[in-house]
Structures are given as C-alpha cells and as structure tokens.
Amino acid sequence: MRTLWIVAVLLLGVEGSLVQFETLIMKVAKRSGLLWYSAYGCYCGWGGHGRPQDATDRCCFVHDCCYGKATDCNPKTVSYTYSEENGEIVCGGDDPCGTQICECDKAAAICFRDNIPSYDNKYWLFPPKNCREEPEPC
C-alpha cells in the first residue's frame, strides 16, 4: 500500500519530459520507471546525494549530472522529439534543449536496461540517512 501511495504522489508532479522519460524507459528497458526507479538508491527519484549504491543507482547519478549540464533548460518540463529507427531511439527536433534532455533520458534508459541483472531490491525505498557520504563529482 505504501508503494502505491508513493507512486500516486510522484505522479502528481509529473509533466513534460518526465512523462517522456517514463515512456523511453518502458521502450528500452521494458520496465516502468515509476515502479522500478522512482525511489531506488541515493539518486533514483527526487534529489540525490551521497554516493551511488550500485550500477543502477549510478545510472540515476549520471542522469542527474547530464540534466545538470543542460544549461538554460528545465529538464523536468521541456518536451522533446524522438523517433525509433531499427529499434534504436533517435533524438531530434529543432529545440536544442529538447534534444539535450532526450539524449540524457535515452542514455539513462539504456543504462537501466544494461544493468537489470544487478538491480537489488534492498535499494528500493533506500533510507536517505544511508546516503550521507561525500558525493563524487559529475
């Protein structure tokens, strides 16, 4: 029941590219980003601090860094354009911000897919108090 409540709360704030990010994760990793990655480790979900706990958490850390490098963009609300060509996601469109955010989301979705074998349920709903180590630079 607690998980359903968390998902409902997270959906309240979802807009723009966050919906598209969920779609990319579903297409590439064949999993729901909300159900698998919205509250995982120290970096998957809102905020992020400490050190990534495993390869999956590192996907979120790198994604946060990628968003941080998207200068003059609001990554959580910018919509973007992409297509599928030969089973691959291709980011495009005329908006440089949108393309940059799409590339961040695409890389994270691929990272999630590639690290499914190392996903560890012990990091789901991981307590923030366990994420107090000095963060590494992006």
UniProtKB/Swiss-Prot annotation:
Disulfide bonds join C42-C131, C44-C60, C59-C111, C65-C138, C66-C104, C73-C97, C91-C102. The active site is at H63, D105. Its cofactor is Ca(2+). GO terms for cellular component: extracellular region. Changing E133Q: In the alpha form. It catalyses: a 1,2-diacyl-sn-glycero-3-phosphocholine + H2O = a 1-acyl-sn-glycero-3-phosphocholine + a fatty acid + H(+). InterPro entries: PLipase_A2, PLipase_A2_Asp_AS, PLipase_A2_dom, PLipase_A2_dom_sf, PLipase_A2_His_AS. The keyword Signal applies. Expressed by the venom gland. GO terms for molecular function: calcium ion binding; calcium-dependent phospholipase A2 activity; phospholipid binding; toxin activity. Keywords: Calcium, Disulfide bond, Hydrolase, Lipid degradation, Lipid metabolism, Metal-binding, Secreted, Signal, Toxin. Belongs to the phospholipase A2 family. Group II subfamily. D49 sub-subfamily. The keyword Calcium applies. One of its GO terms (biological process) is negative regulation of T cell proliferation. Binds 1 Ca(2+) ion per subunit. It holds the Pfam family Phospholip_A2_1. Dimer. Residues 1-16 form the signal peptide. It is found in: Secreted. Its EC number is 3.1.1.4. Ca(2+) binds at Y43, G45, G47, D64. This is Acidic phospholipase A2 beta.
